[in-house]
Swiss-Prot record:
One of its GO terms (cellular component) is cytosolic large ribosomal subunit. Component of the small ribosomal subunit. Mature ribosomes consist of a small (40S) and a large (60S) subunit. The 40S subunit contains about 33 different proteins and 1 molecule of RNA (18S). The 60S subunit contains about 49 different proteins and 3 molecules of RNA (25S, 5.8S and 5S). One of its GO terms (molecular function) is structural constituent of ribosome. PANTHER family: 60S RIBOSOMAL PROTEIN L10. NCBIfam families: PRK04199.1-4, uL16_euk_arch. It comes from the Eukaryota. Keywords: Ribonucleoprotein, Ribosomal protein. It comes from Dictyostelium discoideum. Belongs to the universal ribosomal protein uL16 family. Pfam families: Ribosomal_L16 (PF00252). This is Large ribosomal subunit protein uL16.
Length: 217
């Protein structure tokens, strides 16, 4: 029996049903990589941030998310190089889909029970997304804007419903606007923290404050 089309599971109809000790035998999600590209790049290297945002409340299958990730990664790697960006998948397929299998061969009516005991068996996983929720985020250099927008446009064809591409006003994956980030950087109050930054505040001991300022500069 083939895989049931994802259009059968597009809408969020019931409560979330996740893997647990009561829900066993769930097949692994097709997507295994949620962070790709140059993950260790500092915040100063990739100031531009672009998001792919959902415009509908729906369910995205793990197969669709993986297809979108591959499509996006392939285009940017080909046009700008595999070290020219850092991409994050911002949704996770936690919700478990069920299927009540029916036999369709000759003599099946003597073997199956119809809708008696119709609670199905796990068949796959999906991510439940809301209106305005971010699906993919990419940080990169300013001159890569056109390439990133095109990559996200191509990946959006892998998903049902409508999506929009938004160029963020924030600096990379940080929580600060460009002006605020550059001001904090000029004041020497930012410490690198992976793909993000930590702001040195006027709290704590003087010794710790001096240590943080020295590390930032």
């Amino acid at each position: 029996m083939g895989r049931r089309p994802a259009r059968c599971y597009r809408y969020c109809k019931n409560k979330p049903y996740i893997k647990s000790r009561y829900c066993r035998g769930v097949p692994d999600a097709k997507i295994r990589i949620f962070d790709l590209g140059r993950k260790k790049a500092s915040t100063d290297e990739f100031p531009l941030c672009v998001h792919l945002i959902s415009l509908e409340k729906e369910q995205l299958s793990s197969e669709a998310i993986e297809a979108g990730r591959i499509s996006c990664n392939k285009y940017i790697s080909k046009t700008g190089g595999k070290d020219s960006f850092h991409m994050r998948v911002r949704v996770h397929p936690w919700h478990v889909l069920r299927i009540n299998k029916m036999l369709s061969c000759a003599g099946a009516d003597r073997l199956q029970t119809g809708m008696r005991g119709a609670f199905g068996k796990p068949m796959g996983t999906v991510a439940r997304v809301n209106i305005g929720q971010i699906i993919f985020s990419i940080r990169t250099r300013d001159n890569m804007l056109a390439n990133v927008v095109e990559a996200l446009r191509r990946s959006s064809y892998k998903f049902p419903g409508r999506q929009k591409i938004v160029v963020s006003k924030k600096w990379g994956f940080t929580a600060y606007n460009r002006e605020a980030y550059q001001k904090l950087k000029a004041d020497g109050r930012l410490m690198n923290d992976g793909a993000n930054v930590k702001v040195i505040t006027n709290h704590g001991t003087l010794a710790q404050y001096a240590k943080d300022i020295a590390a930032a500069n």
